[in-house]
């Protein structure tokens, strides 16, 4: 399952590691070091999935604020949150705000890949379900 993924993290090494891991699996990736750049990239071309770090230095908003912005504009965009300083409360807050899931750094590559695959699959199924519901009244009308 190939997708276009935006990676937002203030640490270049983390962005590169995630990007290489995903590219090795056939995904196309784009990287942003802060919320401002992420918003610009999202506005230009919404991806299939976004991976957002919660704590970003030198950014005009943190990952939870960016998540709120993303969900306000792209409510169906799957978002996976990552953090090296996360707590259970932070993870719960992110999921309540619409994140698909939360991964704590450091993480294993296979865990990241599984989360990305599951988030993209859930998004695809939600989209297909909405399309079927939209067609259902047409198909059930008597001739």
Model-assigned labels for residue ranges:
Residues 26-36, 41, 60:
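Short hydrophobic/Thr-rich beta-strand motif most characteristic of the beta2 strand and flanking loop
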Residues 45-51, 56:
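Active-site beta3 strand of CheY-like receiver
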Residues 39-40, 62-76, 93:
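Short amphipathic alpha-helix used as the core "switch/output" element in two-component signaling
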Residues 111-143:
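Flexible nucleotide-interacting loop at or near the entrance of a catalytic core
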Residues 16-24:
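Charged docking surfaces used in two-component/phosphorelay signaling
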Residues 87-89, 103, 107-117:
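C-terminal output helix
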């Amino acid at each position: 399952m190939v997708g276009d993924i935006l990676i937002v993290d203030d640490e270049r090494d983390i962005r590169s590691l995630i990007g290489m891991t995903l590219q090795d699996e056939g995904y196309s990736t784009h990287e942003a070091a802060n919320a401002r750049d992420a918003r610009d990239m999202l506005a230009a071309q919404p991806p299939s999935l976004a991976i957002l770090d919660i704590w970003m230095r030198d950014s005009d908003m943190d990952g939870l604020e960016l998540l709120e912005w993303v969900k306000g504009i792209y409510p169906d965009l799957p978002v996976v949150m990552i953090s090296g300083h996360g707590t259970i409360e932070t993870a719960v807050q992110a999921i309540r705000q619409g994140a698909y899931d939360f991964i704590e750094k450091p993480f294993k590559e296979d865990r990241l890949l599984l989360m990305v695959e599951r988030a993209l699959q859930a998004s695809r199924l939600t989209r297909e379900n909405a399309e079927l519901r939209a067609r259902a009244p047409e198909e059930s009308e008597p001739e």
